[in-house]
């Protein structure tokens, strides 16, 4: 994948929820919740500050993160699904 997000945007590969529950029940696609965890696959160069400097991002490629449920833009590249979102929509690193 060759994508370079702009400014403080981040590209994530969503980590899908388990197919089975702890009791072995298979969860159908219609009942699955939208993923809120992902792996960072690309980061922008940072947000431009008022003084002209760039604020470094707090996440890096390879980090596993939790993000807001309805944030970002879903895209498909080479048959794989990704999410582009602003760094501020990332809630925590795992």
UniProtKB/Swiss-Prot annotation:
<comment type="similarity">
    <text>Belongs to the GroES chaperonin family.</text>
</comment>
<dbReference type="GO" id="GO:0044183">
    <property type="term" value="F:protein folding chaperone"/>
</dbReference>
<dbReference type="InterPro" id="IPR020818">
    <property type="entry name" value="Chaperonin_GroES"/>
</dbReference>
<dbReference type="GO" id="GO:0005524">
    <property type="term" value="F:ATP binding"/>
</dbReference>
<dbReference type="Pfam" id="PF00166">
    <property type="entry name" value="Cpn10"/>
</dbReference>
<dbReference type="InterPro" id="IPR037124">
    <property type="entry name" value="Chaperonin_GroES_sf"/>
</dbReference>
<dbReference type="GO" id="GO:0005737">
    <property type="term" value="C:cytoplasm"/>
</dbReference>
<dbReference type="GO" id="GO:0051082">
    <property type="term" value="F:unfolded protein binding"/>
</dbReference>
<dbReference type="GO" id="GO:0051087">
    <property type="term" value="F:protein-folding chaperone binding"/>
</dbReference>
<keyword id="KW-0963">Cytoplasm</keyword>
<keyword id="KW-0143">Chaperone</keyword>
<dbReference type="InterPro" id="IPR011032">
    <property type="entry name" value="GroES-like_sf"/>
</dbReference>
<dbReference type="GO" id="GO:0046872">
    <property type="term" value="F:metal ion binding"/>
</dbReference>
<dbReference type="GO" id="GO:0051085">
    <property type="term" value="P:chaperone cofactor-dependent protein refolding"/>
</dbReference>
<protein>
    <recommendedName>
        <fullName>Co-chaperonin GroES</fullName>
    </recommendedName>
</protein>
<comment type="subunit">
    <text>Heptamer of 7 subunits arranged in a ring. Interacts with the chaperonin GroEL.</text>
</comment>
<comment type="function">
    <text>Together with the chaperonin GroEL, plays an essential role in assisting protein folding. The GroEL-GroES system forms a nano-cage that allows encapsulation of the non-native substrate proteins and provides a physical environment optimized to promote and accelerate protein folding. GroES binds to the apical surface of the GroEL ring, thereby capping the opening of the GroEL channel.</text>
</comment>
